[in-house]
Structures are given as structure tokens and as C-alpha cells.
A protein has these predicted regions:
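Divalent-metal-activated hydrolytic enzyme cores
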Residues: 1-70, 94, 103-112, 116-123, ...
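Short glycine-enriched loops at secondary-structure junctions
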Residues: 77-82, 102-105, 131-134
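Short, glycine/acidic-enriched capping/hinge loops at junctions between secondary-structure elements
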Residues: 84-89
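Short helix-loop-beta junction
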Residues: 90-98
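Conserved functional hotspot residues or short segments at active or partner-binding sites
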Residues: 128
Length: 225
């Protein structure tokens, strides 16, 4: 199910808990890309099943991390308050390098931040995390269909998502869900296509770029093909 290290990973099923294999790497500061992905998905399995451990959230952890950070995953997620990466992946302080914006869309600032996580902090995994019933996708669809002006700087979000969302509106199924998944795929491609820092590490096998979707109803994360 997991591609070889360095690939742009894609799948369409929920990944079951990896159990002891993941736990063995839980405190490692330099996991492989595959180990990092398994650790994330195992954490989500714990959270979604009501068995979250809430690790690395003590004052001792605060003091331990004061001298530096070694996150094992780089997250490009939506700003939606219901999708906080540390919570849904059952992680804690210093575990994830978060980059969040409405619609989880890559612009130059977000790309620079993600590259910082890769280049300076050595994260072996990037996850583009979309989610069910995304408000930014919904707003983009409404703007396309009605032609109504979008207020303020929200228009910048809609303009960024429009080229991704518009082509899938004629597809069968729920348009918002189609847009969510199309956007995840598009941002995965954009990270590799626009960043030589990311592309070089992907080709070297030291970095994976993964698309994923969070289900608001079940709390489960699935990888997006």
C-alpha cells in the first residue's frame, strides 16, 4: 500500500493501525518516509477509535523542545478548526510542522514554509490534507455557479482554487467532494513541480509527498489516489 521511499504516494483506502511496528519508531527523530507515514496513520487510527494517547504535551516536553525541533512530518492542511493535525493524528509538541490555509492550497509563502521544513528541519514526509465538506471548496463552487463577487481577500482563495475545481463540476457525484479530492491531487503535484528542493528529495528517495482526506463524520484519514 505504501510506495517506495521518495515517491509521490497515492491510495484510496483507510490504512489500519500498524501497531508495534509504528510504536517502535514513535520517538525517533529521523524516521524513513514510510515509517513517518505509518506513524501518522497509526496515530489517526488511535484518535478515531477513541484510544488517543495525547503524547508530547507536558511541560517536560516544552523544556525538551526549547533547544530545537525535529518534526517527522510536514503538513499542508486547511485552516478549518475541526481539522487540527496534532489532534487528528494523535501527535504533540514538536512532532508536526504545520502549514495551514483555507483550501490547503500552495502559494509562494506556503511553499517557502514547507521547503523550510524539508531543507532546514529534514522532514521526510509531506502530507497534503484536505477534508470532507471543505468550506473553501464550497465557496469556490458557489462563486463559479452564481458569478457573484467574493468579498475581500476571500477572493484570493477562490481564485486559487477555481482552476482546480471548475473542471470537475461536470463529473458525477458530489461536486464538493470531487473538488476536495481534485484539489488534494493538484497540490501534491504542485509541490513537486514547483519546488526543486522537494523534487530532488523525492527523486532521491528521502522524501514522500502524500495526499490525504479527513472525514469529518468518522474522524478517519484516508490517502487520496
Amino acid at each position: 500500500m505504501l510506495a517506495a521511499s521518495g515517491a509521490v504516494v497515492a491510495a484510496g483506502t483507510t490504512v489500519a493501525a500498524a501497531g508495534p511496528a509504528v510504536a517502535a519508531h514513535a520517538d525517533s527523530t529521523a524516521p524513513t518516509p514510510t515509517q513517518a507515514l505509518r506513524r501518522l496513520l497509526y496515530g489517526n487510527e488511535l484518535f478515531a477509535s477513541g484510544h488517543g494517547r495525547h503524547p508530547h504535551q507536558s511541560l517536560e516536553d516544552v523544556r525538551r523542545l526549547a533547544a530545537g525541533q525535529h518534526p517527522f512530518a510536514n503538513i499542508l492542511g486547511c485552516a478549518d478548526s475541526r481539522v487540527p493535525p496534532e489532534v487528528i493524528f494523535d501527535q504533540g509538541l514538536g512532532d508536526l510542522f504545520d502549514n495551514r490555509v483555507a483550501g490547503n492550497v500552495v502559494d509562494d509563502l506556503l511553499l517557502g514554509s514547507i521547503e523550510f521544513g524539508v531543507e532546514e528541519l529534514g522532514t521526510p514526509l509531506i502530507v497534503v490534507l484536505g477534508h470532507e465538506r471543505c468550506g473553501a471548496i464550497t465557496a469556490t463552487i458557489n462563486a463559479i455557479r452564481t458569478g457573484a463577487p467574493v468579498p475581500g481577500h476571500i477572493a484570493a482563495v477562490v481564485d486559487a482554487l477555481r482552476p482546480v475545481v471548475e473542471p470537475v463540476l461536470s463529473q458525477p457525484g458530489d461536486p464538493v467532494e470531487n473538488g476536495v479530492q481534485a484539489n488534494v491531487r493538484a497540490q501534491v503535484r504542485a509541490l513537486v513541480d514547483r519546488s526543486h528542493i522537494i523534487a530532488e528529495r523525492v527523486h532521491a528517495g528521502t522524501l514522500q509527498v502524500v495526499g490525504a482526506r479527513y472525514d469529518l463524520d468518522t474522524a478517519r484519514v484516508t490517502l487520496v489516489r
